[in-house]
A protein has these predicted regions:
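Alpha-helix N-cap/helix-start motif at helix boundaries, enriched for small hydrophobics
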Residues: 81-85, 141, 274
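Residues that define the loop-to-transmembrane-helix transition and helix capping
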Residues: 11, 81, 148-149, 254
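Transmembrane helix-loop junction
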Residues: 3, 63, 75, 107-111, ...
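Secretory targeting signals
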Residues: 21-26, 33-39, 44-48, 90-155, ...
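Transmembrane helix segments
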Residues: 24-27, 148-245
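Helix-loop-helix units of permease transmembrane domains in multi-pass membrane transporters
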Residues: 60-90
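Hydrophobic alpha-helical transmembrane segments
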Residues: 1-75, 88, 98-104, 133, 193-198, ...
């Protein structure tokens, strides 16, 4: 957290967030009298993450690797999990602090009309969880490169891709064979991950064969699952689609579990990468 205070990253983030939400708040809510803060401010402000996430995460690990100070982390008695969680919590703390600005704006809006605080708080939670997911991705990207500019560019590309997923799902081919192909490639990727972690070809081959066998059985038993399968897969993985429920005031437990699981996966991947470099 101290590194954020002594750098421009936190100040740039707060300036961008306050400026963007302030514009949407004043132009849409105050000028036109719309009191649905979540729909008009939070929904439109998601585009900010394309810039905010790279700014806040690019230095988390990349800068330390460049300056060779990461060796101090690898040789210290502190566990990799504690290092990753500490850095991650520092970045999401800034995100949580910015939510206070949104609540202040919603409070001002309530003085001029009827504001549904349930929708505001639900939208605030959704906006925070969406940002927390993208922060976890950005931190993982920062951990795999030693150049913060490259980390920023990769984070920008990944976040932009996440934002475009709902549009991509509308243009992907709907034929079942494309779904089979993507599923098989995903299984092979998982098998490669097991081999990379265990260096055991038998385990990796077993995972790959079992996964492909499951795909084959499902294609025979429930072939309808693979019709427009790519769109279904993309929609399921889309972090932005789930955020829309929060903006509508819908507190969906499955969406919360999805976001938390998404965060946990990328924190785990970051921890594994650090642990691997620590032993190497």
């Amino acid at each position: 957290m101290r590194s954020y205070v002594h750098s421009l990253a936190a100040y740039i983030y707060f300036a961008l967030f306050i400026a963007a939400t302030g514009v949407y708040f004043s132009v849409i809510c105050m000028s036109y009298g719309y009191t649905d803060y979540s729909q008009y401010v939070f929904s439109n402000s998601t585009i900010l993450y394309i810039v905010i996430v790279p700014i806040l995460t690019m230095r988390l690990f990349a800068e330390e690797k460049k300056q060779r100070t990461d060796q101090l982390l690898y040789t210290s008695p502190i566990r990799p999990g504690s290092i990753v969680l500490g850095k991650y919590l520092a970045s999401v703390t800034l995100l949580a602090m910015s939510m206070l600005v949104s609540l202040i704006e919603a409070g001002v809006l309530s003085m001029f009309g009827s504001v549904s605080w349930k929708t505001v708080l639900t939208g605030c939670l959704g906006y925070f969880l969406l940002g927390a997911c993208l922060m976890a991705v950005g931190m993982f990207v920062s951990s795999i490169t030693d150049n913060q500019m490259i980390a920023a560019a990769l984070s920008f590309a990944v976040v932009l891709f996440c934002m475009l997923l709902p549009n991509i799902s509308n243009v992907v081919p709907g034929r079942a064979r494309y779904t089979y192909l993507v599923c098989v490639l995903a299984v092979l990727l998982v098998a490669w991950f097991f081999y990379d972690e265990t260096k055991n070809m038998k385990i990796a081959a077993g995972v790959g064969i079992a996964g492909i066998a499951v795909i084959g059985v499902l294609s025979k038993v429930k072939p309808a699952l693979f019709d427009n399968g790519l769109s279904k897969i993309i929609d399921w993985f889309s972090v932005l689609d789930r955020f829309n429920d929060f903006c509508s005031g819908i507190l969906n437990a499955s969406s919360i579990v999805y976001y938390v699981s998404f965060i946990a996966v990328f924190l785990f991947l970051t921890m594994q990468g650090i642990e691997k470099r620590r032993w190497n």
